[in-house]
Amino acid sequence: MRHVQAEPSPSSEPEAGPSQPPVRQGALQGGLLMGYSPAGGATSPGVYQVSIFSPPAGTSEPHRALKRQAPPTEGPRELKRGPGLGAREGLPPEEPSTVGLLGPEGLGLGLGVASQHFSHRGLCVVEQRSSVTSSWTSGAWSPPCPPSNASCNTLHTRDWASPDPGGQGSLGESPGPAPPGQLHTLDTDLHSLAQIGGKSPVAGVGNGGSLWPRESPGTANGHSPEHTPPGPGPPGPCPTKRRLLPAGEAPDVSSEEEGPAPRRRRGSLGHPTAANSSDAKATPFWSHLLPGPKEPVLDPTDCGPMGRRLKGARRLKLSPLRSLRKGPGLLSPPSASPVPTPAVSRTLLGSFEESLLRGRFAPSGHIEGFTAEIGASGSYCPQHVTLPVTVTFFDVSEQNAPAPFLGIVDLNPLGRKGYSVPKVGTIQVTLFNPNQTVVKMFLVTFDFSDMPAAHMTFLRHRLFLVPVGEEGNANPTHRLLCYLLHLRFRSSRSGRLSLHGDIRLLFSRRSLELDTGLPYELQAVTEAPHNPRYSPLP
């Protein structure tokens, strides 16, 4: 590797033509370092390396010029850059830069005033401004940077250009062998290069590189790309991130800093950006007009304070209808099907007696051994039957007052027809305790001669303790329930009457009648439904 270091003086005039002396002095402030590496064979061209040194700001110390001639192995070659490429790199179209390569006479270099970048087969150019030494790299290409005090290294290489085994790898180092196919790596702290994989469309760009690489997120002036006026962009489409705002929100274009991001925003989409686009600050204003991704159609009443108020008003308007459907005082929405509620969690609807009969109290325990003997008399006397009674007791009193027992006699063992009885007559039910002693004998008189076929009804026989002398007009608050018998009747399609289902009884301990110590007597009351008295079978 041979190097030629030239230092043009600021006062010298530039010479025209590539066939002038090897070093061309012009408006460039700094020095040139040119190196030539002969090819390994006769078929592959040599490699030329040109380094441009720009002195730091405030430095005017002259440099010593060193000039070396290239070996007379290559013929004269010339490369001119067109106006289009020069305009992209900051050159006016009428002043294209020219790079001239001569043969035995030496190495000639012609540069324009604003030329900083070179691309030629077998030519490597490195620009250095604030640092004395730089590294060579292979297969990398950095984007052009605006003039600033920060260091900016730019180089163009070919991957297939093998370095000279005896050449120098960097400035200030002694010549040494370099591994084939690999050059020194550029400092990653200076540039973050975004390379696009694939073949390069231009022969002067290495494999894996791109003629127009993507710009780094931050520019040289320290501003974000959103607040920097757009410059000449790449010729092809490049995805650009935009901040999309909802259609109802208009951003402040005059503000330099963006406010907090809205709670609901659309996803950013990549759209191709033209080279001569509008100002980047105005982009958030019209970006919401761009076509966005398809989203599920939302009800206009679902978003915004006005929509929420309308929905609330609609709910208040529909609440009276729901209350009429479910009953007064209930605002719960109507359900398609009633939800079954466990018997133990039902509320106490009606009287204490009704709650006991329907099993709305949680039982405290069961007593086994009770039996019941059932008989009837009338136009005919059916046979008496004895069935077991399931007895349950409850603890529903905060004080130690006695609670009644509930007994249930299941009639299903008698068959589907139940216990047959005459339409007019008397039913006798005798309850026995586990000791086979009579607890209570119930006698109920009934008359269902007008009952149609395939209907049903019931009778409820009660026994109260009422004060003596108040049998006719006893106050209900003064009555004390002692016994209760609930019978259910059903007429078949042929008109026969029978007891069906079960028989429910409420009774108390015998001490209840003895421990009162009051002048009370028993009073029997038999009740039946009135309107309607009979109900058709389901």
Swiss-Prot record:
Q: Segment Transactivation domain 1 (TAD1): which positions?
A: 436-444
Give the Phosphoserine positions (modified residues): 254-255
Q: Which UniProt keywords apply?
A: Nucleus, Phosphoprotein
Listed Pfam families: Chromosome_seg, DUF4210
Which residue ranges does the record annotate as region Required for macropage invasion?
A: 348-430
Please list the residue ranges that the record marks as compositionally biased, kind Pro residues: 227-238
Mind naming one GO cellular-component term on file for this protein?
A: nucleus
UniProt biased composition (Low complexity):
1-18, 323-334
| UniProt cross-references to SMART domains, sorted A to Z | DUF4210
Write down the PANTHER family for this protein, in alphabetical order: ATOS HOMOLOG PROTEIN B, GH03947P
Q: What is known of its domains?
A: The protein contains a transactivation domain (TAD) which may be required for transcriptional activation of a subset of target genes.
Similarity comment text for this entry: Belongs to the ATOS family.
- What does the function comment of this entry state? Transcription regulator that may syncronize transcriptional and translational programs.
Q: What is this protein called?
A: Atos homolog protein B
Q: Which gene encodes it?
A: ATOSB
